[in-house]
Amino acid sequence: MTNTFMWPFFKTPVPQEPQETAVAEAPLAPALTEVINALPDPALAVDGQGVVVAANAQAAEILEAEPAGRHLSSAIRVPAVLEAVAAAARGEEGASVDYEIRVPVPRSFRAHVSSLGPGKGALLVLRDLTREQQIERMRADFVANASHELRTPLAALSGFLDTIMGAARHDEKAQTKFLGLMRSQADRMRRLIDDLLSLSRIEMNEHLRPSGEVDLVQVAGHVRDVLSGMARDFDCEVVLDGPGSLMVTGSRDELVQVMQNLLENALKYGSSGKRVDITLRRQHDAAELSVRDHGPGIAEEHLPRLTERFYRVNVQESRSRGGTGLGLAIVKHIVNRHRGKLTIVSEPGLGSEFSIRLPLKS
């Protein structure tokens, strides 16, 4: 993509001002830099040739590179934004442009473009709309998903109450049985609401990369110990193999949640009376953690949908084992927030392997 295409005003050279005017305007850049650095939003100043002459720290963070001194098209590859900046640099009226980027995670922005005068350049201020759009989507999703998934346990609770108040009114043994079933349904609703809230929080902050330092080997060992009781219940051996430590950039609490969801799934659905292998290794500039079970495996047609909200390979089995259908969706969004990658490999009869790959701590 050429600069001429992205910046139409290059086709007609900008008239040169007399030397005296150029000298008089020289102090403009330092003044612009002060103004831009004082702005709370990401901001950049672009000269008449499309080169970024000043940018604040927020702009460098969003663009994941220092844009000053580079052509704007190397940092923002959105034709509508570049055309608006080109027009403003020619002295035309400013404009606002909404746009999205998809890599490394989806984000939405509104670019406010203002002219600094004919031939002098333009000021570009970016407003991150990602969070407010996500909040709006999550409100709608939460209501739709919660109402759908809560309908079954609520109907069961209502039925049990009718029985206790009717046919079992004087039957203490039946009342005890139905109260136990009601407790089970209430626990199911609590788990569902907890997972929905957890997923909503993660999605809300997915565009913000965590900055902590986490030992992935320590996280795996901790989760193995926490779930040792569950492993005994399923008569399953959990084997951990890895180096002394693997440091990654991330949130410890979220990575514990990832590890716990993966190991719980392996124990519940894959390895009753068998074994689960947790393997950690360094792969060039990344850390890889895999959880492998030796259970029945998953048919190929299900694999692309496993991380969808509420998608279950076997609905009845999942619900009977206390699953909410949100565990792998939570894993996917946490891994995305950490700029990592989730890989699922499975074949019927040969078990399943869930692997995450995260950047090493630099």
Predicted region positions:
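Conserved micro-motifs of the catalytic ATP-binding
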Residues: 204-209, 247-250
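Conserved catalytic submotifs in the C-terminal HATPase_c
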Residues: 212, 232, 237-246
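Short helix N-cap motif at coil->helix boundaries in the Bergerat
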Residues: 216, 297-305
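Conserved glycine-rich
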Residues: 339-340
